[in-house]
Amino acid sequence: MAYTKIHAIKATVDKAIDYICNPEKTDEKMFVSSYACSPETAAYDFKYTLDHCRENSPNKAYHLIQAFAPGEVSFEEAHRIGKELADKLLEGKYSYVVTTHIDKGHVHNHIIFCSADNIEHNKYHDCKQSYYHIRKLSDELCKEHNLSVIIPGAQRGKKYKEWQSNQNGSAWKTQIRKDINFCIKSASTYEEFLLLMRAKGYEI
């Protein structure tokens, strides 16, 4: 079972990529992969593509989170699924970085991809239909890997932390408080605090 969520990145693409590539979260970057870019230079690679884009949009990249139910998938398999999801969704047109965070009780993937494609330099259109497409692809991959799938409608409208608390039995308010405290301690600016909270799946 995997929960998916996506949001746009309008600034600090480099900080977002640095966060998802954190060695402490990715087993010293063992679970970091990329396509049509290097994780170390992805922000610059994205900018080069965006500079040639025809559309004027504030969205520089998109951050997709794919979180699995605790204990259902190994680190290695989760990372494979993340790469497969990125490949199926982006069809070889967009540069991306995919990482798997293994430092908590729930394994989850982070996929950050450039908002403009490398071929025609058109922008990715984020809408309700595109999100449903992401969820459909994720569910199909879960089935292929013999993982459970979220029952349609059963999780509708739930935020990421609410879904997660249902999976591991933790109190969602306590978890939110912990996440806020962690991000406050880790961030040096308010913008960075917002970035860290969004990376954890919160809508702000």
Mark where each language-model region is:
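N-terminal nicking endonuclease/strand-transfer module with a His-rich metal-binding environment
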Residues: 1-204
